[in-house]
Amino acid sequence: MTQRFSFELTATDGRARTGVISTPRGEIRTPAFMPVGTAGTVKAMLPENVRATGADILLGNTYHLMLRPTAERVARLGGLHRFMNWDRPILTDSGGFQVMSLADLRKLSEEGVTFRSHIDGSKHHLSPERSMEIQRLLGSDIVMAFDECPALPATEEAVAQSMRLSMRWARRSREAFGDRPGHALFGIMQGGVTRDLREESAAALREIGFEGYAIGGLAVGEGQEAMFGVLDYAPGFLPEDRPRYLMGVGKPDDIVGAVERGVDMMDCVLPSRSGRTGQAWTRRGQVNIKNARHMDDPRPLDEACSCPACRSYSRAYLHHVFRAQEIIASMLLTWHNLHYYQELMQGLRTAIAAGRLGEFVAAFHAARAEGDIEPL
């Protein structure tokens, strides 16, 4: 197994790419979807079951873990991999997005952000240096630079000022990260939906130099059309020989569109959160298992799916246990959703390698257009 971090492109089809990220903890096949293990767990899933869905890498959250159980405690207990029983790669975000969206009484300065915990009101400070320290204590394989995520809508001037602050923080993150063989630091492009700002941000990040590059500040309410508009040009501003990570995306059609535009990595809470709220993602779109139409339906969620929920349980059973608020409902629906997402990624990788992505995407949209199977 390699002792360093590397990325190899193995095939392209149009702007879409497939390849392999190599780390000391294993390979990550791209395009990759990363399930989110916010507080050291993918909710309702055992780590070995997450792996069984086909996931090569998980995402952990700096903000949540620094507050509870604390990064120092995780480090004393052997690091996040041992703590949560996941021996594959882990990517941790920098905490910036959660500070801006969850924390109370934020105070932003050139130095960093002071905020109060949304859990108990305790006061904390995050800076590029502290974020790098926390992620080092956690032991993550891929570390994200500390950035500011401006709330949208915002004026172009406000977005520009925020982006330039993030670029100064990116340089400080790079310096604080130091020399850590086998670990990678990703810079985060910002700039909202303005092409010139995105290009300026990418140029600043390339000058600093990172092992990978993220596209941040999207999937925050701007809509799919605006997001795809940015993705039509933003990946092209980044080095071809480094992974490109679109943060916080998303829905299956968002993922397919992002991959078509040259994105290599994505993460989102959607498949696990949807499972806990009775929503299943299938080849033919979304299924709301709460609906009464499923009450007497002996058929699986998706007859073509090989996950445990589809292999062994009916829609009627899933409807029943969800309505009865049984824990197994969250377990089975989350497993199904994560399995569906990983099957989608494998389909995209195979299609790109074969030069048949256009056919795959057409079939994907055709199946979704059919809608769910007819009620009995």
Curated annotation (Swiss-Prot):
Signal peptide residue numbers: none
tRNA processing recorded as keyword: yes
Enzymatic class? transferase
Q: Which GO terms describe its biological process?
A: queuosine biosynthetic process; tRNA wobble guanine modification; tRNA-guanine transglycosylation
Cofactor binding notes: Binds 1 zinc ion per subunit.
Gene Ontology terms: cellular component = cytosol
- What molecular functions are annotated in GO for this chain? metal ion binding; tRNA-guanosine(34) queuine transglycosylase activity
Protein name (record): Queuine tRNA-ribosyltransferase
